[in-house]
Amino acid sequence: MPPAGGGSESVKVVVRCRPLNGKEKADGRSRIVDMDVDAGQVKVRNPKADASEPPKAFTFDQVYDWNCQQRDVFDITARPLIDSCIEGYNGTIFAYGQTGTGKSHTMEGKDEPPELRGLIPNTFRYVFEIIARDSGTKEFLVRSSYLEIYNEEVRDLLGKDHSKKMELKESPDRGVYVKDLSQFVCKNYEEMNKVLLAGKDNRQVGATLMNQDSSRSHSIFTITIECIEKLESAAAQKPGAKKDDSNHVRVGKLNLVDLAGSERQDKTGATGDRLKEGIKINLSLTALGNVISALVDGKSGHIPYRDSKLTRLLQDSLGGNTKTVMVANIGPADWNYDETMSTLRYANRAKNIQNKPKINEDPKDAMLRQFQEEIKKLKEQLAARAAGGGGPITMPSGGGSPTQKIVERTEEVDPDIDAIKAQMRAELEAKMKSDISTEALDKAREEAEAAAKKQLQAIIDDQGKTEAQKKAARDALKKQAEEARAIAGAIEKEKQEKAVLESRIKEMEGKIVVGGVNMLEKVDELKQKSEDIKREAAIRKRQEEEAKRRLEELQAAQVDADAKFASLDEEINVKSRQLKKLFEKYQGKKGELADLQEQFQREREGMLEDYRILTQQIKLKNLIIACFIPPDYQDKIMQHCHWQDYDSSWNIDCIAYAGNAVRTNQELQAQEDKEHDAAAENERLKNCFFSYEQFEAAGAGSKQGGGGGGGGGGAARPGSSAGRAVGSAARRTGGKAGGKDITDIGSLRDSVNWGDDDDKKKGAIPKAKGLVKDTVDPRLRASKLK
C-alpha cells in the first residue's frame, strides 16, 4: 500500500486521434497527422506550408491512433488511476479538444456492443471487479453523482428538476462542492450504468455543422469509493495493536469529465441558442487554458480558478490533491489544422502541471463508518431484545412499550387470587424463555387463561366467601383478562419491532459491498481472466518499451555531450550532424512561432467578436434602464447594489420591497383570494408606489428622493432637457469616490445617445418601448417575475 502522503507528480497527458469521417472523405480532405504509438509522438504537417518544412512534433505519455480500440485506451490510461482511487487517492480523467473530435465517444461510447463502451462504463465494471476479487476482509461503499455545467450554470442531472441552478460551496474540509447534489449508492455495474443513462438523457446536446450530437455542456460523473476493514476483521487484530491501526476509512473520488468542445462559429454555423452556448463554452475553456498557463508559468502568484464554474470544480484536479489524466482528442483532417495545433499545445503545456496527491483517510463526509456504526448499534439492540425477550414484561401504560421487569399491583384480594396470577405469569414467562413458535405461545397463553379463569370461578362459587370477597374475585378475573390481552399485545409489538430492526439492518448491509464474492458469475470467467492476464502483459511490455526508449534518448544525449573523437574529421562529422538537427529544430520553432502568432490573432479576433456581442447586449440593457428609470433613481439603486464574487451575481438590498415585487405578490394574492378587500389593501400599500410618476405625483419625491440633481427627486424624463441637466450634474459630482468602475451608472447613461439636435430619435423613444420589451433576455423577465 502506498504511503498516505506522497510527493508531487505531473499530470499525465495522452492524445487520441479519430479517423477521417464520411463528410471529410467526401470533401476530399487529406490527413495531416502522423502518430508513432511506440515512441509516444505526434507529428502534424502544415497544409499551407512548403513541402520542405518539417512537421511539428510533440511527445506525450501515450498516444492512440485511429486504429486503437476503446479497451486499449481504458487498460493503459485509466486502470492505474482507478487502482489509486480504490487505495484512497482522488483521480480525474478529462477529455479536451475541438468539437467533433470524439471526446464523448472516448468517455462514454455506446452501451452496445461492449467493444464500443468508453472509459466511464468500463470504469464501472472494473471497480466492481476489484471489489469482487477482494479477500472479503474489507467493506466498500460506492456512490455516484452526475452534473453538468450549461451556460455557466451548474445543474444536477440526477435531480427531479434537472434544469434547476445548483449552488457552489467551498469549505476547508471538502474543498469546492455542489450543495444538495444528488448521490446514489450503487451495489453493482448495472445500477451504476442506469445512473449514467438516466443523467445522459437529461444532458444538453444539439446539432451543428461539425457534429450532429454535439455536447452543449460540460459534464462531470463522480464515483466515490469508501473502503474500511470489516468490524469482525478489526476486532480480530492482535491484542497489542491499537484499536484504529487498521480501521481507517479511505475515500477515493474519481471525476470523469466530458468537456464540451471548443468551436468556431464560421465552422459550426451556430446561431441563436447554439451561438450563445458556443460563446459560454469557449469562455470556460479559455478560463481553463488560463489556469493551465498560470500553473505552468510558476511566476504568477494568482491562479484564476474563479473565472469559471468549470475551473472551480476542477481546482483540485489542476495543481491540487488529485492524480489527473488529460485525454486530448484531435482531428486528422487538414481543415482542422489550427484547432489541432491549439489542442496539442495546451496538452503539451499541461504535462508540466504538478499535483500533490495524498490518500484521504477518515474524511468528515465519509458515509461508510456511519453505516457501520448504525448497523452495529441496531445489532446490539436486536441482541439485547433477544437476550431479554424471555424475561418478565411490564404491562404497557399509556401506550408505551413494555420494559423488562414486573410492576406488581397492590390490591386487597384473596391470597389465592395472587397465587393464580403468579402461576399464570410464570407459565407465560417459561414459554417465552423457550424458543417456541408463535402458535405454541398463543396456545400456552390460552391454556393459562383458561386455567386461571376456572380457578377464579371456583373461588367465586365458593359459598363460604363473603359478598365483598366474591366481588373482589370477579374484579380480579376481569383485570386478569385485560392483563393477559396486554401481555399478548406486548409480545406482538416486540415481534414487530424485531422485524423492523432486522429489515433495517438488512437494508443498511445491502448498501455495503463486500469482497470475496464473485458478483459477475459468468460462464466464461476463466476465459476473461486469461484475456486480462494477456492484456496486463501487453501493458507492461508497452510501458517497458517506453521506459527503454526514454533511457536510450538520455544515454544518446549523454554520449554526445561526453564524446571523445579520434580525429578532426570524425569530430566535424558528428558536429555537422548535431548542427543539422539543431537547424531543423530551429526551423520548426520558427514555423511554430509564426503559427502561434496566427493563433493569437485568431483568438484575439474571436474575443473581440465576443466583446462586440456582449457590448451590444449591454447597450440594449442600458437603453432600457435609461428609458424607464430616471437618472437620480439609477444612482440610488446603484448605491444599494453589491457584487457577489463567490456567486458571480449582483444583489440589491431590500429587493423584496421594490414596487414590482410588491405588485407581483399583490396580483398573486388577488388571484388566490377572490374576495380580497381592495380598499384595505390600498390603505396598507398607500406608501408603496409602482412607478416614479406615482411617487412624484404623491409629493414624496421632494421628501424622500432628493438626489444629486436637486429639485423634486429627478422628476424629469431622461430625454428632456431637465433630465439631461440632472444626468450631467450627477456625472460631474456624484457617484463613488475614486475612478469610474463597472457599478457607476453614470457610465451606463453615457452609452445612450440623447442628442439635442436629433428630434427624430427623441420622438422615437416612447414608441420603442414595446420593441425593447420584446428583446429583453427571457431570464431577466423570469427573474423579475420571481
From Swiss-Prot:
GO terms for biological process: intraciliary anterograde transport; motile cilium assembly. GO terms for cellular component: ciliary basal body; ciliary plasm; cilium; microtubule; motile cilium. One of its GO terms (molecular function) is microtubule motor activity. CDD domains: KISc_KIF3 (cd01371). Its main location: cytoplasm. ATP binds at residues 97-104. Residues 688-786 are annotated as: Globular. It is found in: Cytoplasm, Cytoskeleton. InterPro entries: Kinesin-like_fam, Kinesin_motor_CS, Kinesin_motor_dom, Kinesin_motor_dom_sf, P-loop_NTPase. Residues 717-732 have a biased composition (Low complexity). Residues 700-786 are annotated as: Disordered. Flagellar axoneme. Residues 10-353 form the Kinesin motor domain. Residues 771-780 have a biased composition (Basic and acidic residues). The keyword ATP-binding applies. Residues 367-687 form a coiled coil. Residues 702-716 have a biased composition (Gly residues). Probably involved in flagellar assembly and maintenance. May play a role in flagellar synthesis. Interacts with D1BLIC, DHC1B and DAW1. Belongs to the TRAFAC class myosin-kinesin ATPase superfamily. Kinesin family. Kinesin II subfamily. This is Kinesin-like protein FLA10. It comes from Chlamydomonas reinhardtii.
